[in-house]
Amino acid sequence: MQIERPNVALIAGVDEVGRGPLVGDVVTAAVILDPSKPIAGLADSKKLTDKKRQALAIEIQEKALCYAYGRCSPTEIDELNILHATMLAMTRAVEGLSTQPEFVFIDGNRLPKLTMPAQAIVKGDSLVAEISAASILAKVARDNEMVELDKRHPEYGFAGHKGYPTKAHFAALEQYGAIKEHRKSFKPVQRVLAQAKGEA
């Protein structure tokens, strides 16, 4: 599938990581690539090995014209809901770019609030280089944060499942309860909190 690109110089790509996990921030990245510094091997971050993602993230940071991260905390996710929090995090990423883009490609089927023209592209992380780069930066940043959280709370196994709802994560929630980084509005976490209060 060929994506029609607008005839402007500054195009940003935006993607998110972390809508599904029960813990931690939803993390987004916005990237404007430098056409004079091509990056080989850009692809959907989910299709790359961790080692390849880490290497590409460094290369993107070195070669991109500019990049920025946007995030929403578990508290914001609980207040807004995950969809609205994701949109807000995307807006924050674009607003954080040191050079503002003339056009923005967003991964997915919804557009966040932006001051410039934008287009949402389903599976954009496989179709648009700027979105691929953003997906890699966001994934590496969030995964690294989960590794750090794992050091503080090793009993939950965050370094392995990255906060996603796995059997191991459910078991740890049942055994140890929720930590402050857990998203209290997500049903599995609500269930554990209710049990702890003796309501379930």
Curated annotation (Swiss-Prot):
**Gene3D superfamilies, alphabetized:** Ribonuclease H-like superfamily/Ribonuclease H (3.30.420.10)
**What Gene Ontology molecular function terms does this protein carry?**
manganese ion binding; RNA binding; RNA-DNA hybrid ribonuclease activity
State where the protein is found.
Cytoplasm
Q: Which residues form the RNase H type-2 domain?
A: 9-198
Top-rank lineage group of the source organism: Bacteria
Q: Which residues bind a divalent metal cation?
A: 15-16, 107
What catalytic activity is recorded?
A: Endonucleolytic cleavage to 5'-phosphomonoester
- E.C. number(s) listed in UniProt: 3.1.26.4
Predominantly, its location class is cytoplasm
**Database matches in CDD domains:** RNase_HII_bacteria_HII_like
Record keywords, A-Z: Cytoplasm, Endonuclease, Hydrolase, Manganese, Metal-binding, Nuclease
Q: Which cofactor does it need?
A: Mn(2+); Mg(2+)
- Which BP terms from GO are recorded? DNA replication, removal of RNA primer; mismatch repair
Q: Which cysteines are joined by disulfide bonds?
A: none
**Enzyme class per UniProt:** hydrolase
Q: Spell out the family assignment given in the record's similarity comment.
A: Belongs to the RNase HII family.
Q: Which HAMAP family match?
A: RNase_HII_B
Can you name this protein? Answer: Ribonuclease HII
Organism lineage: Bacteria, Pseudomonadati, Pseudomonadota, Gammaproteobacteria, Alteromonadales
